[in-house]
Amino acid sequence: MSDEVEAGFVRVRLDLSYDGSEFSGWAKQAGGRRTVQGEIEDALRTVTRSRETYELTVAGRTDAGVHARGQVAHVDLPREVWAEHHVKLLKRLAGRLPRDVRVWALREAPSGFNARFSAVWRRYAYRVTDNPGGVDPLLRGHVLWHDWPLDVDAMNAAARGLLGEHDFAAYCKKREGATTIRTLQELSLVRGEDGIVTATVRADAFCHNMVRSLIGALLFVGDGHRGPEWPAKVLAAGVRDSAVHVVRPHGLTLEEVGYPADELLAARNKEARNKRSLPGAGCC
């Protein structure tokens, strides 16, 4: 599948963040629902005085209610539009976009760059507190309250059994034709001085609901309802377990997206498009 930029166009990388509380996710939807993609595309069309809407491609298609601090997207703009507007485009977008979404940087992307397929990892953070009094009101839109005491050491022990390349079908919402094979590079939890437990989750990519399902399983371990070996057993079974809850979205933030060196972007782009299969697993 080719990803060549059309002649006469320039590919532009956008670095952005948003509070997902009032959005129905990243991706545009029918029925006029408010989405991050829709807001940015509308703003781009307005500030460049274009008749056409230029479609964004994003690194991580976040669900409704999920936040992003380090999201990355790209858009292909006509070269004359970019030449005319690039100097003042960032400031004009700041004046046009709603306050819950910001574009922090705009620059011409290097050859071979694709915000989605060139990425080598995405890093999310999920924040939860077991404070008996609940969540700080100033943080309530970004931290989950769990009303059982959490054993972070037990949660980390459970997390270690999930690392590596696996078929995460047991932790993903099934989508027709989509692979559930992923490489979980990091899954660790730390309790801060404020009592908030932050889970760091990093992988080459994530399937639908994967992060929130993993956190749901670890919370069951942390509060003593299951042993540290349970999440790995669920993974090995390969089917959804009714005891694994998909935790609420507001505790989840996309923190950062990683890319290789410029000279490796095109190769990574091509590699990521190849559907994965585990060694020994049946194909198709």
Curated annotation (Swiss-Prot):
Substrate binds at residue 124. The active site is at residue 63. The keyword tRNA processing applies. It comes from Streptomyces coelicolor (strain ATCC BAA-471 / A3(2) / M145). This is tRNA pseudouridine synthase A. Belongs to the tRNA pseudouridine synthase TruA family. The lineage of its organism: Bacteria, Bacillati, Actinomycetota, Actinomycetes, Kitasatosporales. Formation of pseudouridine at positions 38, 39 and 40 in the anticodon stem and loop of transfer RNAs. One of its GO terms (molecular function) is tRNA pseudouridine(38-40) synthase activity. It catalyses: uridine(38/39/40) in tRNA = pseudouridine(38/39/40) in tRNA. InterPro entries: PsdUridine_synth_cat_dom_sf, PsdUridine_synth_TruA, PsdUridine_synth_TruA_a/b_dom, PsdUridine_synth_TruA_C, TruA/RsuA/RluB/E/F_N. Homodimer. GO terms for biological process: tRNA pseudouridine synthesis. Keywords: Isomerase, tRNA processing. Its EC number is 5.4.99.12.
